[in-house]
Amino acid sequence: MHLSFGSLFACLLASSTAVASAPPSNFDVANFKSADIIKRDVAVIGGGSAGTYSAISLKDKGKSVILIEKKGRLGGHAETYIDPATGTPVDMGVLVFHNITVVKDYFKRFDIPLNRADDFMKSEFYFDFRTGRAVTPTFTPQAEEVSAAFAAYLAQYSKYPGLRNGTILPSPVPEELYMPFGKFVEKYGIQAAIPSMYYFNPGVGDILSNPVIEQFRYWSSDMVRSVATGFLGPVRRNVSELYTRAEAELFQSSSLLLSSEVVHALRADGESGVMLIVRTPAGRKLILAKKLLIAFPPKLDFLAPFDLSATEKSLFGKYIDAGYYVGLVKNSGLPNNTSISNAAQGHTDFTFPYLPAAYSFAPSAVPGLQLVTYATGQTTKSLPLSDEAVKADIINTIKRIQKQNPDKFTSTEPEFVTFASHAPYNLQVRAEDIRDGFYDKLYTLQGQRNTHWTGAAWKGEDSSLLWTYSEEIVVPQVIEGL
């Protein structure tokens, strides 16, 4: 399909699919200076992992793009704190990557060297963060048992090759894919793998009640392999460098709008393309694009400006998610040589903690700074807790641990040096929705109304596999329709 931008504008205004909150007159080019009208092959909304990768990939393939990001930076969950005293970077959120071709090619493109990432530090201390008292884990499998359990897990995972291309499931969906993961664990005797699965992937809510397919979406064969053989990470231990370099390149080609937000959208099928009104620090911009690629979490409150169809509203309205938060704390009085994990004696066979709560505290690359992760259970709310409520709970948790263990930890006044909310995290749906074909219906949206979709909801919370999904599936679909 080859469409001029002049005909694109005419087609859109003639379309019967209009935005209820913004009549077509709002999109009249006469309301915009020529410098404020941006014409591109593809408009990408959301500058996180998948959106940034897709914009760069499309650009490399000769397509004109405009990437629109609400925040003042790219990277999404990839956040890096630079210690002002030493210049040492400390990554939060996204830490490591799989040793696969798409990862190595992407970092090489921006001249960022990789090597084997540091192993995750094993906890030597377990406390019930509700009380501050020490907990003794009752289930401590040996390495051989863990390996055998992961092998049994992979034997079941491998029955569903469609998982490489998203969440492509058999029809009808087998009951095994929507049963609670805890029942699946018992059925296949993979208990020894569960502590690793839980602590490697915080932010999923109640792992044992999650439907099996929601666990499969993150714990891919690539993830299991990386846990066994090692992950990759930037040599300079600064994941955000990837995004600052992508940001510089996109700015240079006038392909990026930061601190910007779509306020109205006009989408239609056929040759009509899409029109967007974007609020930017420099005023309103009118975007005329042949295709739209949405790469942020598809929650209804975030999608309000995008003129959703009844089908889109129905599907996206089914999502639940978890709150997930990260931060760095100084003056914690916690050790610099081991991590501390949350546990609750007698709660599940694995002494998993009650949520919402901090998962763990771990030493960072800067002595005296502790990396903390915190999460909630599943919720329909996109932003389940305020940042201030989470930070207050974390500080109170540290003080409880100090008070109950004066022989181990010094009493201090902890302070945050940085904090970030990654909510809504790990979008998923309930068992009955999976049974009723939610994912099959979801993927039929790709390409409708000149709109494509990528991001964790379409694959999983894993940057390496999001890049693979975007490169192998989504970007080719977008280009085919241009």
UniProtKB/Swiss-Prot annotation:
Record GO biological process: terpenoid biosynthetic process
UniProt pathway annotation: Secondary metabolite biosynthesis; terpenoid biosynthesis
InterPro entries tied to this protein: FAD/NAD-bd_sf
Transmembrane segments: none
GO terms for MF: oxidoreductase activity
Keywords in alphabetical order: FAD, Flavoprotein, Glycoprotein, Oxidoreductase, Signal
Secretion signal span: 1-21
Alphabetized Pfam families for the sequence: NAD_binding_8 (PF13450)
UniProt feature coiled coil, ranges: none
Glycosylation sites: N99, N165, N238, N337
Top-level division of the source organism's lineage: Eukaryota
Record-listed E.C. numbers: 1.21.-.-
Described function: FAD-dependent oxidoreductase; part of the gene cluster that mediates the biosynthesis of the sesterterpenes ophiobolins, fungal phytotoxins with potential anti-cancer activities. The first step of the pathway is performed by the sesterterpene synthase oblA that possesses both prenyl transferase and terpene cyclase activity, converting isopentenyl diphosphate and dimethylallyl diphosphate into geranylfarnesyl diphosphate (GFPP) and further converting GFPP into ophiobolin F, respectively. Other sesterterpenoids (C(25) terpenoids) are found as minor products of oblA.
Protein name stated in the entry: FAD-dependent oxidoreductase oblC
Species this chain originates from: Aspergillus clavatus (strain ATCC 1007 / CBS 513.65 / DSM 816 / NCTC 3887 / NRRL 1 / QM 1276 / 107)
Gene assigned in the entry: oblC
